[in-house]
């Protein structure tokens, strides 16, 4: 289907954005999960309380920014929300930790006492009780739902690159898994998580979701956990592929790249460009490679189907979105933050560096993660 806009289209230079960050609540000594989410949420006040959410574990919280227009504003909100949540966690005897997967054994795996969570637990059994995982979800405003579905199609070739940039979960049960994002591996056990299928239209998308619900694969449309989707709750495209980022600047970098990428491909859709129909097996393999290697090895260039050095594809992505970044005033910030990640490594690389330096002391990694999670005082 060729997208035919009803209007001149959205102002692609000023797309709004918002970010959801999920965090673990861990014991400072053992690193084990602590089921104190209710106390942490009760300890928040004002804007932070209004922007907090209960999650799928008693040992998790989610902080959600409001709808925003620029990256500087986003950074200020993320700093404030992380600081408030870290303070509330400490008051509850825990530490707020931004990491994609539970790094040590999780003993508390019960879901909160909410009907929907209990229904998921009954339907999916042990999968619903896997160790907790945390993601970073970026929303970009696109009120035209038909356009949003086509944008999802166009984003698919680039999402493994975004996934690799965010990789921040190499540890599981106190051991290095050999994967940069163990979260991605763990989530594959759910039937409605993974690369987003190609859809011809919004009607095609809705019919597919309805069929999956009727087939018992999902409880409701809220269980569409594909890596990118038209949001079920907001007039946005929601990119869900990434691990939660270790630092505020890592999160803002990803949000800036994603918004510019959405603006770039939305312009292509508006001009009549068709998204490539990538074979599902190749798309899944590209995401596996991103989760395994992060930015330390090769990624699959889905434009050619061949492996290329990961940073070459990051450079290609940056070049692709540079015009959008310039229109949004974000080019210098994103360029500088990519240079920092190139020098320091992804969150997974940073964790492994601490693990090597500390003779495999996982507590040293947890100290590092907690320090990275809490923004430095201004």
UniProtKB/Swiss-Prot annotation:
Keyword Nucleus: no
Catalytic activities: L-cysteine + L-glutamate + ATP = gamma-L-glutamyl-L-cysteine + ADP + phosphate + H(+)
Keywords: ATP-binding, Ligase, Nucleotide-binding
GO BP terms: modified amino acid biosynthetic process
Superkingdom classification of source: Bacteria
Enzyme Commission (EC) number: 6.3.2.2
Any one Gene Ontology molecular-function term assigned to this protein's record: glutamate-cysteine ligase activity
UniProt KW Acetylation keyword: no
Pfam families referenced in this protein's UniProt entry, alphabetically: GCS2
InterPro entries: GCL_type2/YbdK_subfam, GCS2, Gln_synth/guanido_kin_cat_dom, YbdK
Family, as annotated: Belongs to the glutamate--cysteine ligase type 2 family. YbdK subfamily.
HAMAP family: Glu_cys_ligase_2 (MF_01609)
Function: ATP-dependent carboxylate-amine ligase which exhibits weak glutamate--cysteine ligase activity.
NCBIfam families per UniProt: gshA_cyan_rel, PRK13517.1-1
Name of the protein this chain belongs to: Putative glutamate--cysteine ligase 2
Naturally occurring in which organism (per UniProt): Salinispora arenicola (strain CNS-205)
């Amino acid at each position: 289907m060729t997208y035919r806009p009803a209007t001149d289209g959205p102002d692609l230079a000023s797309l709004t954005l918002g970010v959801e960050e999920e965090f673990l609540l861990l014991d400072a000594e053992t690193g084990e999960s602590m089921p104190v989410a209710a106390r942490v949420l009760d300890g928040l006040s004002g804007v932070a309380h209004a922007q907090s959410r209960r999650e799928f574990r008693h040992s998790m919280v989610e902080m959600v920014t409001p709808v925003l227009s620029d990256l500087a504003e986003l950074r200020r909100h993320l700093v404030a929300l992380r600081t408030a949540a870290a303070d509330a966690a400490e008051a509850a005897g825990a530490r707020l930790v931004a990491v994609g997967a539970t790094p040590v054994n999780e003993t508390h795996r019960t879901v909160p006492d909410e009907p929907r969570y209990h229904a998921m637990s009954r339907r999916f059994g042990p999968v619903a009780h896997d160790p907790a995982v945390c993601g970073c979800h970026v929303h970009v405003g696109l009120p035209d739902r038909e356009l949003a579905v086509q944008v999802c199609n166009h984003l698919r070739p680039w999402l493994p690159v975004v996934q690799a940039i965010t990789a921040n979960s190499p540890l599981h049960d106190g051991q290095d898994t050999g994967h940069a994002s163990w979260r991605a591996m763990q989530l594959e056990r759910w039937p409605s998580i993974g690369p987003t299928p190609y859809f011809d239209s919004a009607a095609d998308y809705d019919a597919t979701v309805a069929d999956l619900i009727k087939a018992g694969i999902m409880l409701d449309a809220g269980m569409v956990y594909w890596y990118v989707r038209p949001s079920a709750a907001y007039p946005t495209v929601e990119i869900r592929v990434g691990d939660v980022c270790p630092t505020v600047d890592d999160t803002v970098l990803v949000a800036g790249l994603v918004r510019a990428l959405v603006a770039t491909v939305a312009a292509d859709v508006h001009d009549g460009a068709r998204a490539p129909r990538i074979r599902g097996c190749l798309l899944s393999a590209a995401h596996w490679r991103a989760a395994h290697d992060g930015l330390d090895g090769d990624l699959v260039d889905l434009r050619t189907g061949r492996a290329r050095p990961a940073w070459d594809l990051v450079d290609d992505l940056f070049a692709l979105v540079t015009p959008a970044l310039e229109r949004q005033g974000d080019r210098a910030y994103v360029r500088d933050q990519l240079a920092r990640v190139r020098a320091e490594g992804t969150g997974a690389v940073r964790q492994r560096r601490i693990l090597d330096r500390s003779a495999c002391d996982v507590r040293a990694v947890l100290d590092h993660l907690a320090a990275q999670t809490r923004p430095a005082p201004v």
